[in-house]
Regions:
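Portal/gating segments that form or line small-molecule/metal binding sites
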Residues: 44-100, 107
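Glycine/threonine-rich flexible loop motifs
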Residues: 105-115, 186-189
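Structural preference for alpha-helix termini/caps and helix-kink/transition segments
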Residues: 270-357
Length: 357
C-alpha cells in the first residue's frame, strides 16, 4: 500500500458538463493504463431512472474521456452483506479510480457510513488511488452530511446526517457543501446547497462544523502526492471557520497546509478502525467467496484453463453447501453457473458440469 494518499476531486455540480471534463482527465491521466475505473451508483439508487443515469455517465466517460467505466452497484440498504454487496466491495477494492455523483446526500450516507463501503473508500485513498465525488456524493465526504431533500423539499427542521469524514485523511475537519452559490430560488435563498444561509446558520448552532463550500461547475482537487490543492472551473471554493471566511479562486494551486490550517481538526475524531463484526459470520464469508468467484468467471471466461479451475472451485463449494443442507446458497451457485452457460448435473456424492451447446 502506498504511503501517499491518492488524489480526490470534489465537484460542486456539473460532473458531466464540458466545463469540468479536464478534471476527470487530470485524475485519470495520473493512473497507469489500463485504468480500472468504477462508478458507485448509491446516491441515485432510489431513483426510477437509475439505469438511465448509469448509461449517461458511462457514455460521458466513453465519449469524452475514452474510458470504459464499469458499474459497482449498491442501491438499497437491503443489499448490505449480500452476495451483490460483496461483489461491489471486491470491484471497488480493485479500482484505481472511483466515481460517485448525483442523487440524495442522505440516501448515500445511509448506504455508506459505518459499513464496509466506508472502509473500502478509506483504503482506496490510503493506497494512493484516485476518486471523484460530485454533488450528492461530495456532500458525504466531511464530518457531517447535509440532508438537502429533507430540509429543502420536505421542510424538516435542520439537522445533520453522519458523514464519511474521508477528508479527515487529508487533515481537514469540515462539512462539504456543494452547490454553494446556487441561485435557482430566484426570490428565496438557495445558496449553501439549496438550504439557504438562515437554515445553515441554525445547523451551525445545533452542531458546529467548519464549512468547505464548492460553487457549481467548480472542482476542488486535493493531491495527497503533491500535498497541494487546486481550484478549477467557473466558480470558487469558500472556507468558513469560527474566525473568518476565505475564498480560493479558480485557476490557482495552493499548499495543502493552507487548507489544513483553516480547517483544523476538531477534538471529535472518527475511529480509524470500523467495527466489522457482522461481516465475520459464516454466511457472509460464503457470500463473499461466491461474489469473488463470480467476478473472476466474468473476467476470465475467455481463458479456458482458468475458467475450468474457477468452475471447479464453484462446484466444490456447492457440493460442500449441499452436504451442509444449505440449499439456498447452493442454488445460488447453480444460478451463477447456468447464467454463464454452464449445465450442472447433480448426483448423490458428486456434481458434474459441461458447457451448454
Amino acid at each position: 500500500m502506498s504511503n501517499q494518499l491518492g488524489t480526490i476531486a470534489i465537484l460542486g455540480s456539473g460532473e458531466t458538463s464540458p466545463n469540468l471534463v479536464a478534471v476527470h482527465r487530470k485524475l485519470l491521466q495520473e493512473i497507469p493504463k489500463p485504468v480500472k475505473a468504477y462508478m458507485l451508483d448509491s446516491p441515485f439508487g432510489f431513483q426510477e431512472n437509475a439505469e438511465q443515469l448509469v448509461e449517461k455517465i458511462q457514455d460521458f466517460y466513453d465519449l469524452s474521456l475514452n474510458i470504459k467505466i464499469k458499474l459497482a452497484s449498491y442501491r438499497n440498504i437491503e443489499e448490505l452483506n449480500t452476495k451483490s454487496f460483496f461483489k461491489t466491495i471486491s470491484l471497488l477494492e480493485k479500482a484505481d479510480f472511483i466515481f460517485a455523483g448525483p442523487g440524495s446526500p442522505s440516501y448515500a450516507s445511509k448506504l455508506w457510513v459505518n459499513n464496509e463501503i466506508e472502509e473500502t473508500l478509506f483504503n482506496h485513498i490510503k493506497k494512493g488511488a484516485n476518486a471523484l465525488f460530485a454533488s450528492a456524493a461530495a456532500t458525504t465526504l466531511g464530518e457531517n452530511t447535509l440532508p438537502v431533500y429533507e430540509i429543502y423539499k420536505v421542510g424538516i427542521d435542520p439537522y445533520w446526517e453522519e458523514g464519511l469524514d474521508l477528508l479527515g485523511l487529508y487533515g481537514l475537519s469540515c462539512t462539504v457543501v456543494p452547490h454553494f452559490n446556487n441561485r435557482e430560488g430566484g426570490n428565496h435563498d438557495t445558496s449553501f446547497s439549496y438550504v439557504g444561509k438562515n437554515r445553515m446558520s441554525k445547523l451551525m448552532e445545533i452542531n458546529y462544523s467548519n464549512l468547505l463550500g464548492i460553487d457549481e461547475h467548480t472542482a476542488l482537487i486535493i493531491s495527497g502526492k503533491e500535498n497541494t490543492f487546486e481550484v478549477y472551473g467557473l466558480g470558487q471554493v469558500t472556507v468558513i471557520n469560527e474566525d473568518k471566511t476565505l475564498e480560493f479562486k479558480s485557476g490557482e494551486t495552493y499548499d495543502l497546509t493552507t487548507l489544513q490550517n483553516h480547517l483544523s481538526k476538531s477534538h471529535k475524531d472518527k475511529p480509524s478502525e470500523i467495527n466489522q463484526e457482522a461481516k465475520q459470520n459464516k454466511s457472509d464469508e460464503t457470500l463473499r467467496k461466491i461474489a469473488n468467484l463470480e467476478i473472476q468467471i466474468e473476467e476470465n471466461e475467455s481463458n479456458n484453463k482458468i475458467f475450468k479451475e474457477l468452475v471447479t472451485q464453484l462446484i466444490d463449494l456447492r457440493l460442500k453447501l449441499r452436504s451442509e443442507k444449505n440449499y439456498e446458497m447452493s442454488d445460488m451457485i447453480r444460478d451463477i453457473l447456468e447464467s454463464s452457460n454452464i449445465q450442472i448435473e447433480d448426483s448423490t456424492d458428486k456434481i458434474e458440469w459441461k458447457i451448454k451447446d
